[in-house]
Design a protein with these regions (language model features):
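Radical SAM enzyme core and accessory elements
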Residues: 1-108, 112-116, 120, 413-489
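Canonical Radical SAM [4Fe-4S] cluster-binding loop centered on the CxxxCxxC motif
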Residues: 159-195
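A C-terminal junction/extension of Radical SAM enzymes
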Residues: 34-36, 355, 359, 363-433
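Beta-strand scaffold of nucleotide-dependent catalytic cores
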Residues: 166, 280, 348-352, 421, ...
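N-terminal [4Fe-4S]-dependent radical SAM core
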Residues: 88-95, 115-163
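Conserved non-cysteine loop/helix-boundary elements of the Radical SAM core domain that shape
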Residues: 181-380
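Short beta-strand motif preference
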Residues: 50-52, 165, 279-281
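Key residue(s) within conserved catalytic/signature motifs
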Residues: 143, 176, 255
């Protein structure tokens, strides 16, 4: 299925709604005459038209141009995208569970509408009628929004921020992964220089945060795989964090322990000793066959052993990640993984839906979305989490997620992941250290934002580190220039 779009300066809205039905279809804005197996969305001077054709069968919908936005109408881009959705829903018989919603933060949308004074009935109509969202997904989003409100009030207090520290090294690359990460064996020579620079950047963040009058709320060390560092390197990094920040005032300090093939008892003890209050051990699946399919070099038993080591080290707040839709997995296999995770009783279980990124080996090797038809049925098994006492506390979506589904963090009551909520709902400044880091400066409750980017690759981050430090001065400058007298208060 090819997607053709004409008559618009950008096909963004149409493309994303079409991809709800055909996630990996090629797109062109300059089409020839429609051929077999194509979707053609067109805006002309007189109206809108969408045609779908597969073989000898075709169907077309037409509509007049919408009223201008200032007269209560909508943009031609959105109107054509909506017409595309209506046609493809009729053509395929598929109703995407999130309807016409393509944004990654549906819960944020609920918060925004409530803040704008919308009634519950108005928000209901917005989701269920205008965007054709399923009642099940909308009710889950509302439940999460209700749970998040007191946490967001704390996190959105003036001049609070969270610190993210990125470790872009992994022992091997998983087949679904498209993140910038370095193979530890190949790039081991970069690790120590990288850690040295990272510690210096953490120190500079403390300086700039103090200049701006910011108060640290939470810390997250992610990756990559942070435990690909040696125990000594973890001590160096986490020691730098402890020396520069008052951890007694931090509400949450997370370290992704990640994979059991590089997480041992010594590293888990270091993480606990240096102040982390929450860790993540990420099995993705408890099937040895599926682990092999995705390139993991460890077994399900290794995950169980790592989890036991973490409990012995004194870790009392543990998250475990699972992924629905991994190659070779089945609904029954995913249910087994979910039941195994629940049996361990971690404080958090996060269920991701596989996302087909073009840089991942799954897509490169042409394992397309049709191989994963059971993913929605897998997510239906999450009722087991609710029955076991977990509740959903944050939700986000990504482009090209299988069947347009979502990622949901589940927690035992009182164990919500604060950093996850803050970064998803964009209420708080996030100061990022490390290669690929994206600092997000937030003011006025999210109404004003600015980003500061680090260099993407570890070798460039190391070689151009002086520029990294220079860019960090933009943190204090943002508050000095944008907040005026408040910046010195």
């Amino acid at each position: 299925m090819k997607i053709y779009i004409t008559g618009l300066p950008s096909g963004y809205e149409v493309e994303h709604l079409a991809r709800l039905f055909y996630p990996m279809a090629p797109l062109t804005l300059t089409p020839p005459e429609p051929a077999e197996d194509c979707l053609w969305a067109e805006k002309t001077d007189t109206g809108l038209r969408v045609l779908v054709r597969q073989g000898e069968k075709s169907k077309m919908l037409e509509a007049p141009l919408p009223l201008p936005v200032e007269q209560g109408g909508e943009t031609p881009e959105f109107a054509l995208a909506s017409l595309t959705y209506d046609l493809l829903r009729q053509w395929t018989g598929i109703r995407p569970p999130w309807g016409k919603m393509t944004g990654v933060r549906p819960v944020r949308l609920i918060h925004d509408k409530r803040a704008a004074g919308w009634s519950a009935e108005q928000i209901d109509r917005f989701f269920l009628q205008r965007f054709d969202c399923s009642e099940q997904k909308y009710e889950m989003a509302k439940e999460i929004a209700d749970l998040q409100e007191p946490i967001l009030r704390m996190g959105s207090a003036p001049k609070t921020y969270s610190l993210y520290i990125g470790i872009p090294f992994c022992p091997s690359r998983c087949s679904y992964c498209s993140f910038v990460s370095c193979n530890l064996d190949r790039d081991r020579k970069l690790v120590q220089p990288y850690v040295d620079c990272l510690c210096r950047e953490v120190e500079e963040i403390r300086v700039q945060a103090e200049r701006a009058g910011l108060t640290l709320c939470s810390i997250y060390i992610g990756g990559g795989t942070p435990t690909s560092l040696s125990a000594a390197q973890l001590r160096q990094l986490m020691g730098t964090v402890r020396e520069n920040f008052d951890l007694s005032k931090v509400v949450e300090y997370t370290v992704e322990a990640g994979r059991p093939d590089c997480t041992d008892a010594e590293k888990l003890a270091v993480i606990k000793e240096y102040g982390a209050t929450r860790i993540s051990i990420n099995p993705q699946t408890f099937s040895d066959a599926v682990l092999a399919n995705i390139g993991r070099k460890h077994s399900a038993q290794d995950i169980l052993d790592c989890y036991a080591d973490a409990r012995r080290a004194g870790h009392e707040d543990i998250n475990m990640d699972l992924i629905a839709g991994l190659p070779g997995d089945t609904v029954e296999g995913f249910e087994h993984s979910l039941r195994q995770a629940i049996a361990l009783q971690p404080e958090n279980i996060t269920v991701h839906t596989l996302t087909l990124k073009r840089a991942s080996r799954i897509v490169i090797e042409d394992q397309k979305e049709n191989d994963y038809a059971d993913v929605a049925a897998m997510l239906e098994k999450c009722h087991l989490l609710a029955e076991a006492g977990y509740r959903p506390y944050y939700l986000y979506r990504q482009k090209n997620t299988l069947q347009n589904l979502e990622n949901v963090g589940w927690c035992k009551p009182g164990h919500e992941g604060y950093y996850n909520i803050y970064i998803m709902e964009e209420v708080q400044t996030i100061l990022s250290a490390g290669a690929g880091g994206s600092t997000k400066l937030v003011a006025d409750g999210g109404k004003r934002m600015q980003r500061i980017f680090n260099f993407k690759y570890p070798n460039e981050y190391i070689q151009r580190f002086a520029e990294v430090l220079e860019r960090k001065k933009g943190v204090a400058d943002f508050y000095d220039h944008d907040l005026g007298p408040e910046a010195s208060g």
